[in-house]
A protein has these predicted regions:
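Long, low-complexity or tandemly repetitive, helically biased scaffold regions used
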Residues: 259-466
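Structural signal for hydrophobic/aromatic residues that build the beta-strand cores
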Residues: 78-80, 87-91, 157, 188-192, ...
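Low-complexity, Pro/Thr/Ser/Gly/Ala-rich linker/spacer regions in secreted
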Residues: 514-520
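Intrinsically disordered, low-complexity segments that are common in secreted/host-exposed effector
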Residues: 505-513, 563, 584-587
């Protein structure tokens, strides 16, 4: 988008030490220290100062780049430079880099802004005949000069509160907003009506506070009460004559208006491209937040294999973010200075979306990882109080312990499987590095990894896993009081038994990697009924049939409480019960 040639550019100082007469390069949004058009004395002679007193506050109930940029009144162009990390912010503007670390955090920010004076150069300074150092125009390092500065200070109080799964995020944020709106009123001496008592005090205690400001504080506030105390002192901290005020907004005049030899801003970045870059970075932030929550999930902390993969994904995304921002930082000044077209930025954005780091593919990985965690968590819920073992060493201690003759382990066998997508992300980063090092041979060798189905997406594996969990759970319940046998759940890599397998250990030795606990048999069939006997035909369930060593049958006369038990200590599936009373009804 061609530069409109506006006579001046207004922008926030963002904590940077901008002063009247300082040179500025709008192509890279950097200030040029140590080089000026005028001497110090000439600058001081023709500066006009006027009072500009104003105080404002606003509540920011959003954590998006857009709303933060709006609070600081950033232009689209300056926002693009911030996205590419061309601008190092300081003071209150450091608030821009603070994002929520969890989706279970409610966040509301209070923005305080005060101004006290406005300084600007007179028109006599801007005449070419008054320029003390005209060589600046030939150097091409700057495009603009600071001709006006608005002084004051700003502060952001950022309040966070953890929200439990049983609470409403919207409701909590609404209550936080109401309480934070009271701070300027109470600090101003106004009477505020509203909720009183222990409940409100409890809510205040649940807040954490972070402070980003242009004021020098002895101690930063960390609680709601601290914030109220600090807020009430802010007006005095500017000093009696406002001597502690800092630049909050500046106005830049193009050097090309003074001399045509000067470097100039050729074109601006289209707002739609800035928005696309902003969306890409915000999505990476969302992925980071999701990962932060997932690594703390019960399933991830129980099985470190899952946790490690999420952490690896998060680290790869952070590396990609840095690479993407470096590309922006390299390309934006070139476009603005006329050295490249906007198509260069379009190519960067397109390549990102078509790479393994594209929005859809990042979402797919996180959704599948969440699906895997939910799948495993459903096992843990079904198994109730069965002990879960997180490490190999802990499992070995249990297996080798002489306290139990048998260890029956429900083994999750596929949690260690390599993630082809993580390998693909790694390769993508390597390819980008190889291109920078101008090694096409290495770049071409980094081929794309073919997609593969996850273990929990295979219907046959899911079916077998459900059967194994049900069988293991029932077997563990029946044998709960058996002191010779211990039941555990563990993660054990085993490609021969994908998904789940039941391991049986006896006296420290692995006896079976595919143990099928015998299930409760179906009701026996009656045959050969005589006056004093009946033949039972046992009807075992298919699952666990191989592990059956005998049967136990119980019977009683209908109406009586006591049962009589008979045990068959072999695998024969027919047995004759004798000694029954004639003309009597029995229940088996």
């Amino acid at each position: 988008m061609a530069y409109s040639g506006a006579p001046t550019i207004e922008m926030p100082a963002l904590g940077r030490p901008l002063r009247l007469g300082m040179l500025y390069d709008c192509r890279s949004d950097t200030l040029i220290p140590g080089i000026t058009l005028w001497g110090i004395e000439a600058l001081k002679k023709d500066v006009e100062t006027m009072p500009k007193h104003n105080t404002e506050f606003q509540i920011i109930a959003s954590d998006t780049i857009e709303d933060k940029a709006s609070a600081l009144r950033l232009s689209s162009s300056l926002k693009a430079s911030l996205l590419g990390r061309l601008v190092e912010v300081g003071g209150s503007a450091a608030f821009l880099n603070d994002t929520k670390k969890s989706k279970y955090h409610a966040r509301v920010a209070l923005h305080y802004s005060v101004t006290n004076r406005f300084e600007h150069l007179t028109m006599s300074q801007l005449g070419t005949e008054n320029v003390s150092y005209p060589a600046v125009f030939d150097q091409g390092t700057a495009t603009h000069v600071v001709t006006a500065v608005l002084y004051g200070a700003q502060a952001f109080f950022v309040f966070d509160r953890e929200v439990s799964s049983s609470e409403s995020m919207r409701e909590i944020e609404g209550k936080m907003k109401l309480m934070i709106e009271k701070i300027p009123k109470v600090s101003g001496g106004a009477e505020v009506s509203g909720e009183k008592g222990n409940k409100e005090e409890e809510r205040k205690e649940n807040f954490s506070c972070k402070f980003y400001g242009d004021f020098a504080l002895e101690n930063n506030p960390v609680t709601y009460q601290d914030a109220m105390g600090v807020y009430s002192t802010l007006p005095k901290r500017l000093g009696v004559a406002g001597e502690n005020a800092v630049p909050v907004r500046v106005w830049l005049y193009p050097l090309s208006k003074l001399d045509s030899r000067a470097a100039q801003l050729v074109r601006e970045i289209s707002a739609v491209l800035v928005y696309d870059a902003q969306s890409a970075l915000e999505h990476l932030t969302e992925c980071d937040v999701r990962c932060n929550d997932m690594v703390k999930d019960r399933t991830a902390t129980t099985f470190p294999e899952i946790q490690r993969k999420i952490q690896q994904f998060r680290d790869l995304c952070k590396q990609h973010r840095q690479t993407f921002q470096k590309e922006l930082a390299r390309t934006l000044p070139s476009i603005r200075g006329g050295g490249a077209e906007e198509g260069a930025l379009v190519e960067i954005l397109t390549n990102k979306e078509q790479s393994p780091f594209g929005t859809q593919r990042l979402n797919e990985f996180l959704e599948k990882k969440q699906e895997e965690m939910d799948f495993v968590n459903s096992y843990l819920a079904e198994l109730g109080e069965v002990e879960v073992v997180s490490s190999r060493s802990e499992r070995q201690c249990i297996v080798l312990s002489p306290r139990h003759d048998f260890i029956v382990s429900l083994s999750l066998t596929s949690l260690h499987n390599e993630e082809s997508y993580l390998s693909e992300l790694n390769l993508s980063l390597r390819r980008q590095f190889m291109k920078k090092t101008h090694d096409p041979a290495l770049a071409s060798s980094a081929c794309e990894t073919p997609k593969s189905k996850q273990w929990f997406e295979d219907e046959e594996i899911r079916r077998k896993a459900r059967q194994a969990v049900k069988s293991f759970s029932g077997f563990a319940r029946v044998n709960k009081s058996n002191g010779k046998t211990r039941f555990i759940v563990a993660s054990v890599p085993d490609k021969d038994n994908p998904g789940t397998a039941i391991y049986l250990y006896e006296d420290g030795e692995l006896i079976s990697t595919n143990f099928e606990p015998p299930s409760k048999p179906r009701p026996p069939l009656m045959d050969g009924i005589r006056h004093d006997r009946v033949q039972l035909t046992f009807n075992p369930a298919a699952y666990g049939r191989a592990a059956i060593s005998g049967y136990r049958a119980e019977y009683r006369i209908v109406g009586q409480e006591n049962w009589t038990a008979v045990t068959v200590n072999n695998k024969q599936e027919t047995f004759t019960v004798t000694g029954l009373r004639a003309n009597t009804e029995y229940q088996f």
